[in-house]
């Protein structure tokens, strides 16, 4: 890959990963629109690792407290502090893990098309609009296993490019009455095991074919995506309660309409 391609795609990943607009869709579309060769799924996952490091750093204090409560709950065999939230993240991850193992190859072969991305961008943009109207003031700490499983099932749909993992998990949480910040916080925490699972799956493939991954490109991509993702998350969390989801809904509808025009 050319250095300019790495920089642009890593920035796209970092900016779009935690916004409800589908980072995977943008990583597929940018090369297509600019006439660049597909960077491949391995690069996609590598820059996801960069965004993972950003979210781990942003939530480092929260994660430390949650893990402390979680291990205390195991030792005491009862819920301690906010340990339930860790269990909720775990249960919400199960559906995407199962569906990913079962349908990953099918999705890679048939769903990475401009038309699919256009349709899912529009449909789930509309869903985000109606979910935005249902939000209340529930925080992520009021999450239950039942709600987590519902959000987890929704997250599994995000295996299809254009749906947006962060978008559909926030949509589901908003529909369930969580606040904008609560929905975003749970979505971001939920991204941690999902990105680890995706990275692990691709790492197995890369071990079998180490030449498939240009390591110098990946190192640069990870750094750029990490820095841009951290800045984006910090800004997003600072304004989401004020701007709500309408700007992202409008963006998705415009993008989806443009893609339909482009690919039909």
Swiss-Prot record:
Belongs to the UppP family. This is Undecaprenyl-diphosphatase. InterPro entries: UppP (IPR003824). It is found in: Cell inner membrane. It catalyses: di-trans,octa-cis-undecaprenyl diphosphate + H2O = di-trans,octa-cis-undecaprenyl phosphate + phosphate + H(+). The chain crosses the membrane at residues 1-21, 39-59, 83-103, 113-133, 143-163, 184-204, 220-240, 243-263. Bacitracin is thought to be involved in the inhibition of peptidoglycan synthesis by sequestering undecaprenyl diphosphate, thereby reducing the pool of lipid carrier available. One of its GO terms (molecular function) is undecaprenyl-diphosphatase activity. HAMAP family: Undec_diphosphatase. The keyword NADP does not apply. The lineage of its organism: Bacteria, Pseudomonadati, Campylobacterota, Epsilonproteobacteria, Campylobacterales. PANTHER family: UNDECAPRENYL-DIPHOSPHATASE. One of its GO terms (biological process) is regulation of cell shape. GO terms for cellular component: plasma membrane.
């Amino acid at each position: 890959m050319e250095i300019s391609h790495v920089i642009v795609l890593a920035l796209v990943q970092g900016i779009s990963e935690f916004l409800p607009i589908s980072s995977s869709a943008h990583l597929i579309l940018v090369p297509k629109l600019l006439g660049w060769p597909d960077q491949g799924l391995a690069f996609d996952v590598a820059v996801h690792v960069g965004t993972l490091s950003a979210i781990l750093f942003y939530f480092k204090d929260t994660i430390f407290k949650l893990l402390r409560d979680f291990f205390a709950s195991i030792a005491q065999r009862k819920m301690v502090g906010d340990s339930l939230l860790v269990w909720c993240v775990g249960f919400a991850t199960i559906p995407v893990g199962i569906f990913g193992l079962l349908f990953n190859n099918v999705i890679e072969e048939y769903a990475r098309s401009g038309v699919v991305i256009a349709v899912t961008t529009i449909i789930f943009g509309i869903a985000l609009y109606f979910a935005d109207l249902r939000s209340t003031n529930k925080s992520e700490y009021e999450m239950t296993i039942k709600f987590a499983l519902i959000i987890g099932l929704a997250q599994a749909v995000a295996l299809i490019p254009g749906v947006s993992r962060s978008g559909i998990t926030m949509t589901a949480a908003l529909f369930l009455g969580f606040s904008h910040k609560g929905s975003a916080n749970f979505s971001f925490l939920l991204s941690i095991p999902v990105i680890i699972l995706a990275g692990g799956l691709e790492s197995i493939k890369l071990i079998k074919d180490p030449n498939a991954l240009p390591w110098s490109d990946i190192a640069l991509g990870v750094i750029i995506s990490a820095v841009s993702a951290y800045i984006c998350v910090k800004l997003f969390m600072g304004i989401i309660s004020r701007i709500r989801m309408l700007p992202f809904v409008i963006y998705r509808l415009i993008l989806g309409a443009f893609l339909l025009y482009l690919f039909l």
